[in-house]
Structure formats: structure tokens, C-alpha cells
From Swiss-Prot:
Single GO cellular component term: extracellular region
Organism: Aplysia californica
Propiece residues: 21-79, 90-149, 160-175, 250-259, 270-300, 311-319, 330-338, 349-357, 368-376, 387-395, 406-414, 425-433, 444-451, 462-470, 481-489, 500-507, 518-526, 537-545, 556-564, 575-583, 594-602, 613-621, 632-640, 651-659, 670-677, 688-695, 706-714, 724-757, 768-812, 823-862
Name of the protein this chain belongs to: Protein PRQFV-amide
Positions of the UniProt region annotated as Disordered: 32-68, 424-528, 549-634
Length: 862
């Protein structure tokens, strides 16, 4: 028992004593943990602590968030792609923490300082006092301190002058692909364009815009992509690719042509004409005649055209392909057309050093002292008078010369001259060895060489027995007597004149023959002759079996003439061509036919011009294109498949059908029973009894219409040009109107009105007495002769339906254009219905019923 008590006492002492083993072990572990915590506190950065912070003397804690502790610029930078900044950025204050930085270079904390102070003590930090911050602010910062690394997409607004974000470092500030910067825009863009407006390809703006434009769309304002601006613009207009400017521009060095393809300028320019940056110099500059590499500034990117007057532009340069200049130039001695000027028209007197060395296209005018003119690179055309151009060089493909030359003994057209028109007397050494295109005039020399593809010769030749046209001559026009050995074996294009010899070989694709032939029995046109113009009497065996293009003249006994393979055109008189076959796509026939009952135009004849009397069986069933002439008894003419055009007089075409997309009809029709039901394009002439159906997309009607009560243009009529008169409607017309209106379809076009419910494009003409017209919804534009009426009363309180319930101009969908006379002041328009295009004279929007409604109510029609 005592032993048990002893064991218990030892156990209690060991367990609960002051120096017990568990207590010592716990104290030792606690001491080790305290030492570990102290060492960890000495090593770990402040950012490793949580938000609990440090315990102060008063028992409170100084709480700092992770954002305050994570400005360790290796781990706490901006991580989510700043997309867009819109607004104004000012200079940051001194005690502002930069949020977007990469690292701080040039600052090394001392070893004696706290790790926290060493990590965050930089200019603008919260851990520095005022004196340290002001002293550190003066230190320069590196380029890496001013960078966005996450692709800012767009900046729109005004940026001030910042000491923190310097101007020279702005390119580094937005480093990766800023998409667009657009300058200062006015808060409300209404009225005339401001000077600093930079848009995106403005297309069109015509007229004056109202000052107050809120929530409305009158005709004068085009919201997106205006096409054109016509009028007077402020000086500092800088756009992107302006297409056209018409008007007067004053002298201002800041707004004229930018460097992006100015197309057209028409007007008057004074002495301060600027082509590029710093182009105009107010002092005299001397320049050598041949110094092409001068420092003159000009149109750097292809100005197309200039029309006007230039007086003192000695240094004017069209260095890059100006197309055309029209006007007067007096003292442009140094005018440089060094890169492909296209055309010059006017008077030049003192241009001794005028340089057209690089492909000028055309010059028209008078030259007296241009001895050193260089046309060495493809001048196209010269028209005028030259007297002393001994050194004139057209060595590289001149296209055309028209005028008089007397002393041009050394004139060289050795490299592809295209055309020469005039008189030459002493051009013994004239060489057309390389593809001359055309010569018009008189030649007496025998040594002219046309061996290499001459295109055309027009004139008289007497002793040219050895002329060789063996290589693709294009055209010869004139008289030949002894040209027995002329070889046209290789694709001659055209011959015009008189020939008596029967040995001419046209076996290889002659294109055209114009003249008189008598005994050419063996003339072979077996391979694609294009055209014959003249008189033939005994050409019974002429073979046009292989795609002849055109025959013009008189034929009497050509019974076996075969046009079976795509003849293009025949012009002349035919009497007994009963077997003439146009079975395969003849294009055109012009002349008189009397007894051709079997004439077959079954396969796409294109055109017939002449008089036909008894062509009852004429078949135009397969896409005839055009018929021009007089028809009297053609009741069976079938235009069932897309006839394009008819020009002439028709009297009894009761069964005339243009049911499938006829394109055009020009002439007079008296009794036209069925209509042009499918997409007729154009009608020009006089119509009286209008049962014609334009139900499917008629394009155009030009002429006078009298009783068009049933005229229908329900689907996309494009244009009407003419005069329409209106008188009071009678009772029959009103009853008929009610029958039409009861169907509730906007497709009725009556005597005084044009209804085009779907995409009416244009109306040109005069419309009178249309006081009864009223607008419906969705009209985009209302402009008319209001006569100072209060248009603003037109509001949502007026119960105008969206379908047709009245007579008038109903244009509900996408009306494009109106051309005519419009009166009234358009500035006072205050509509709410997206007005498209409404025209009337006069017009009123009042709540009382219209004239037509009163007339309909008088007859019991509601």
C-alpha cells in the first residue's frame, strides 16, 4: 500500500511540479518558436504579413491593405489590359502613388534602413516625408518608368502638358499599337464643320446645316459617311482622302493639299499656292536647266488635275504624275513635268527648259522657244505649231503628233510612235521601224519602213511599190495603183480605198475593208473578217461562214450569203435574200428589207435598224436586243425573251408582248393592250391609252402622260422625267380611286401623283396642283413650297397610317433623290417622322381633312 502511495506521489510530482519534464519541454519549445518568429520577422518582407498589422502601444492595430503592401513593382503591377482611356490627364501630384510601373532603377536603399523603407522609399511614396519627396522629385527618371505594357487600345481626348509625362516620351508611354487618336471634338456637331474636325472619309455634304438639330433628321443632314461637301470651308480642314472640292480657297499655308491623293481642284488660286510642306518660297531661286534632283517641293502623291491660272510659280513641280493642267502659264521656266504629266492645254511662251522627260501624255498649245524639249519617255500627243525643234526627240513611244513641221530632219520616231498627222517634205530618214500606229498626210519617199506593225496610214501614196505590210498592219486609207505585191497575209485590220487587183489575200483574219471592188471573185473572207463597207455586184461566192463581223453596202445577188456563224452587222439594201440566215447570234442589221418572210432571228439578234413591212413571221423569240424602224403589220412579233430596245412607230401592235424584261422602248404607241409586265427599263415617247403594266420594276419613263389612271409602278420605278398636269378629279375617277384604295396596297399611280412604295430613286420634272398630297410615316425628307406655313405642327398627334389611304406621293421605303424646284425655308423644318423625300406645291400639315378626303366624303367614301 505504501509502495502504491509512493508511486502516486512521484507521478503527481513529476506531472505537476515546477520543474517537471513536460513543463520544461513546453518552455523549451516555446523558446524555440519565439526565436524562429524573431528570425522570420527579420527575414520576411512586410508584404508577407496579413492585414492584422502591428499592435500599437494603446492596443490598437495599424491596418494596411494588401494594395498598400503589394506595390512591389515586380508582382503588383497592372495585370488586366487597359483597354481605353477617355478624358483628360493632368500632371500627377507629388504624393501620388504610381500604379503602373515596372521597376525603380537607380535607387538602392542602405543596409541600415528598414526593409520596408528600403523597399518603398521612392519619389511619391507614402513612406517619405516632404523634404525627402521634394528632393527626390528632381531626379531624372528612366524611359522604363513611363510605359504601358498591356496594349492600351485607344485614347480619345485632350492631353495637357505634363511634367510627369513628357512630350518626348509620349511615344514610349503608349508603346504597343495605340489604334487611334482623335483630337478635340465639339460637344455638339451641328452646322458648319469646325476647322479641327478630322473625320473618316466624309463623302457628301451639300448645303447649310441648321444650328439646332436635336432628335430630328431633315434632308440637309446626312449622318453617316457624307459623300461630298460643296461650298466654303474654313481654312484648317484636314481630312482623309477628300474626293472633290469645288469653290474658292484663300491663301493659307496650313490647309491646302495634304499628302494623300488629292483628286481634283477646280477654281482660282492666287500667288500663295502650296503643293506640299514649305513649297512656296518668296525669294528667287536659280536652277540649272537639266538639274532634275532639285530640292523643290511639290505634289508628293499624285495630284490629278489643276484648272486655273498660275503666274509666278517658277518652282512649281508636278513631280509625281499630275494628270492635267488647263490654263495660262507665262513664266514657268522651271516647271517640272518629270513624272508622267498627262495633259497640258494652254499657252506657253518662255518655257525654254520645260521638261516632259518622263511620259507626258499630251500637250496642246503654242510653242516657240522650246528647243530643248525632251519627249524621250513616251509622250502621247502634241498638238500645235513647232518651228525650231531640231533636237526634238520622240524616241520612246510618242503616241500622237498633230500639226505642221518644216525643219524636223532628224525627227526620230524609232520607238513605237503611235500617230502623226500633218505634212512632211524632207523626212527622208523618218523611221517607223517600231510599231507606228498612225500616219495622216502626204508622203513621197520610198524608204519608209513599215516593217514592224504599223497600225494605220491615211493619205496618198504614189511610188510606194515596196511597202511591206507583212507584220500586222492595222489600217490603210487612201489610193493605191501599183501595189500589186502588197502582202496583207498577217492580220491586216482595215483597208479603205480603191483596189483593182484580184490577187489580194485576206486569208488570215482581215478586220475591215472599205471601198469599191469589182472583180474580186476569189476574195476569201473565210477567217473572221470583221467589216466590209462598199459596193459589191458579183460577189456571189463570198464566204462569211466564219464569224464575219460587219457588212455595209449594197448587195443584189448574194443569195448564197451565209451568215451562219455570228455575223455582227449588216448595213445596206437587200431585195432577194430569202435564204439569209441569222440563225446564230447576229448582232445588227441596218437597211431595208421587203420580202424576207423567212428571216430568222431566232438566236439573239442584237439590233435591227430600217423599215419592215411584211415581216409577219419575224421571230425575236430569243433575246433580241434592239429594233429601230417602222412596223405596221407585225401583230405576231414576239419579244418574249428580254428584248432590249425598240425605236420607231407602231400602230396596231395589239398583241405586242414585252412580258420578260424588256429594257427600252422608244417611239409612239397608240393601242398597247398588254403591258411591260416584267422590268421594263425605259420608255421614251408619247402614250395615250395606258393599260401598260409596270408592275415589276420599271426603271424609267420619259415623256408626256395624259390619262394614266391605271398606270402602275408598284415595284421600284427608278425615274420619271416630264410634265404632269392635274385638273379636278371627276366622279368616275374618284370611284375608281376608291376601288384601288380599298385594296390597301401602295401601288397605284394616278394622273397627278407618283406612288412608289419601294425604293423610288429619282423624280425630275414639274408637278403642279398637288395640294391634296399628304405624307405618311417614315418619310425621310420633306422639302417643298410651304409658303411660310407652320410645318412644326406635324407631330405624333396626327393619325397618319403607314399604308395607302389617300392620293399622293407615297414613298415609304428608301427614297433616294429628288431633283427639281423646292421652295420655302428649310431651316424651320421640325419633323418627327424621319422624312425621306416629299415634294408638293403647296403643302400644309393641319388637322382638318385634306381636299381629297373631303371629296371622297362627299361621295360617301370613307
Amino acid at each position: 500500500m505504501s509502495s502504491q502511495l509512493l508511486i502516486c506521489s512521484v507521478f503527481v510530482l513529476f506531472t505537476f511540479g515546477p520543474n517537471s519534464f513536460p513543463s520544461c519541454l513546453a518552455q523549451e519549445q516555446a523558446g524555440n518558436s519565439d526565436a524562429t518568429q524573431l528570425s522570420a520577422d527579420a527575414k520576411a518582407p512586410e508584404s508577407a504579413k496579413d492585414k492584422s498589422g502591428d499592435v500599437q502601444n494603446d492596443g490598437t492595430k495599424s491596418v494596411r491593405s494588401k494594395r498598400d503592401l503589394e506595390i512591389d513593382f515586380g508582382s503588383g503591377d497592372v495585370q488586366k489590359r487597359a483597354r481605353e482611356f477617355v478624358g483628360k490627364r493632368a500632371a500627377p501630384p507629388v504624393f501620388q502613388t504610381p500604379l503602373v510601373q515596372d521597376k525603380i532603377s537607380g535607387f538602392i536603399p542602405s543596409e541600415t534602413e528598414s526593409p520596408v523603407i528600403g523597399e518603398f522609399a521612392f519619389p511619391g511614396s507614402v513612406f517619405m516625408d516632404d523634404e525627402e519627396a521634394l528632393g527626390a522629385e528632381e531626379e531624372p527618371m528612366d524611359d522604363e518608368d513611363l510605359e504601358f505594357y498591356k496594349r492600351p487600345r485607344q485614347f480619345v481626348g485632350k492631353r495637357g502638358i505634363d511634367d510627369y509625362l513628357l512630350q518626348e516620351k509620349l511615344k514610349d508611354f503608349i508603346e504597343k499599337r495605340p489604334r487611334q487618336f482623335v483630337g478635340k471634338r465639339p460637344r455638339q456637331f451641328v452646322g458648319k464643320r469646325p476647322r479641327q474636325f478630322v473625320g473618316k472619309r466624309p463623302r457628301q455634304f451639300v448645303g447649310k446645316r441648321p444650328r439646332q438639330f436635336v432628335g430630328k433628321r431633315p434632308r440637309q443632314f446626312v449622318g453617316k459617311r457624307p459623300r461630298q461637301f460643296v461650298g466654303k470651308r474654313p481654312r484648317q480642314f484636314v481630312g482623309k482622302r477628300p474626293r472633290q472640292f469645288v469653290g474658292k480657297r484663300e491663301a493659307d499655308p496650313s490647309f491646302l493639299f495634304e499628302d494623300k491623293r488629292v483628286r481634283d481642284f477646280v477654281g482660282k488660286r492666287s500667288l500663295d499656292f502650296l503643293g506640299g510642306a514649305n513649297w512656296y518660297n518668296p525669294y528667287d531661286v536659280t536652277m540649272e536647266p537639266q538639274s532634275e534632283g532639285s530640292d523643290l517641293q511639290g505634289f508628293s502623291k499624285r495630284p490629278r488635275q489643276f484648272v486655273g491660272k498660275r503666274d509666278a510659280f517658277d518652282m512649281f513641280e508636278f513631280s509625281k504624275r499630275p494628270r492635267q493642267f488647263v490654263g495660262k502659264r507665262d513664266q514657268d521656266e522651271m516647271f517640272d513635268f518629270s513624272k508622267r504629266p498627262r495633259q497640258f492645254v494652254g499657252k506657253r511662251d518662255l518655257q525654254e527648259f520645260f521638261d516632259l522627260s518622263k511620259r507626258p501624255r499630251q500637250f496642246v498649245g503654242k510653242r516657240e522657244f522650246d528647243d530643248e524639249i525632251d519627249f524621250s519617255k513616251r509622250p502621247r500627243q502634241f498638238v500645235g505649231k513647232r518651228e525650231n525643234d531640231d533636237d526634238f526627240d520622240l524616241s520612246k513611244r510618242p503616241r500622237q503628233f498633230v500639226g505642221k513641221r518644216e525643219n524636223d530632219d532628224e525627227f526620230d520616231l524609232s520607238k513605237r510612235p503611235r500617230q502623226f498627222v500633218g505634212k512632211r517634205e524632207n523626212d527622208d530618214e523618218l523611221e517607223f521601224s517600231k510599231r507606228p500606229r498612225q500616219f495622216v498626210g502626204k508622203r513621197e519617199d520610198d524608204e519608209i519602213d513599215f516593217s514592224k506593225r504599223p497600225r494605220q496610214f491615211v493619205g496618198k501614196r504614189e511610188n510606194d511599190g515596196e511597202i511591206d505590210f507583212s507584220k500586222r498592219p492595222r489600217q490603210f486609207v487612201g489610193k493605191r495603183e501599183n501595189d500589186d505585191e502588197i502582202d496583207f497575209s498577217k492580220r491586216p485590220r482595215q483597208f479603205v480605198g480603191k483596189r483593182e487587183d484580184g490577187e489580194i489575200d485576206f486569208s488570215k483574219r482581215p478586220r475591215q475593208f472599205v471601198g469599191k471592188r469589182e472583180n474580186n471573185d476569189d476574195l476569201d473572207f473565210s477567217k473572221r473578217p470583221r467589216q466590209f463597207v462598199g459596193k459589191r455586184e458579183v460577189d456571189d461566192e463570198i464566204d462569211f461562214s466564219k464569224r464575219p463581223r460587219q457588212f455595209v453596202g449594197k448587195r443584189e445577188n448574194d443569195d448564197d450569203l451565209d451568215f451562219s456563224k455570228r455575223p455582227r452587222q449588216f448595213v445596206g439594201k437587200r431585195e432577194n435574200d430569202d435564204d439569209l440566215e441569222f440563225s446564230k447570234r447576229p448582232r445588227q442589221f441596218v437597211g431595208k428589207r421587203e420580202n424576207d418572210p423567212l428571216l430568222d432571228f431566232s438566236k439573239r439578234p442584237r439590233q435591227f435598224v430600217g423599215k419592215r413591212e411584211n415581216d409577219d413571221d419575224l421571230d425575236f423569240s430569243k433575246r433580241p436586243r434592239q429594233f429601230v424602224g417602222k412596223r405596221e403589220n407585225d401583230p405576231l412579233i414576239d419579244f418574249s425573251k428580254r428584248p432590249r430596245q425598240f425605236v420607231g412607230k407602231r400602230e396596231s401592235d395589239g398583241d405586242f408582248e414585252l412580258s420578260k424584261r424588256p429594257r427600252q422602248f422608244v417611239g409612239k404607241r397608240d393601242v398597247d393592250g398588254p403591258g411591260l409586265s416584267k422590268r421594263p427599263r425605259q420608255f421614251v415617247g408619247k402614250r395615250e391609252d395606258y393599260d401598260i403594266d409596270f408592275a415589276k420594276r420599271p426603271r424609267q419613263f420619259v415623256g408626256k402622260r395624259g390619262n394614266e389612271d391605271e398606270f402602275e409602278m408598284s415595284k421600284r420605278p427608278r425615274q420619271f422625267v416630264g410634265k404632269r398636269n392635274f385638273e379636278e378629279l371627276d366622279q368616275d375617277f374618284l370611284r375608281h380611286m376608291h376601288d384601288i384604295l380599298d385594296k390597301r396596297i401602295p401601288q397605284f399611280v394616278s394622273l397627278p401623283s407618283l406612288t412608289a412604295a419601294k425604293r423610288v430613286r429619282e423624280f425630275v420634272g414639274k408637278r403642279s396642283d398637288a395640294a391634296f398630297l399628304e405624307t405618311l410615316r417614315h418619310l425621310r425628307d420633306y422639302v417643298g413650297g410651304q409658303d411660310e406655313q407652320n410645318v412644326s405642327e406635324f407631330s405624333y398627334q396626327h393619325p397618319y397610317p403607314s399604308d395607302l389611304n389617300d392620293v399622293g406621293l407615297i414613298q415609304q421605303k428608301r427614297i433616294r433623290e429628288f431633283v427639281g424646284k423646292r421652295g420655302g425655308d428649310v431651316d424651320d423644318i421640325n419633323t418627327t417622322y424621319r422624312l425621306g423625300d416629299f415634294v408638293s406645291q403647296p403643302m400644309s400639315f393641319v388637322e382638318e381633312p385634306s381636299w381629297l378626303c373631303r371629296q371622297l366624303n362627299a361621295f360617301g367614301i370613307s
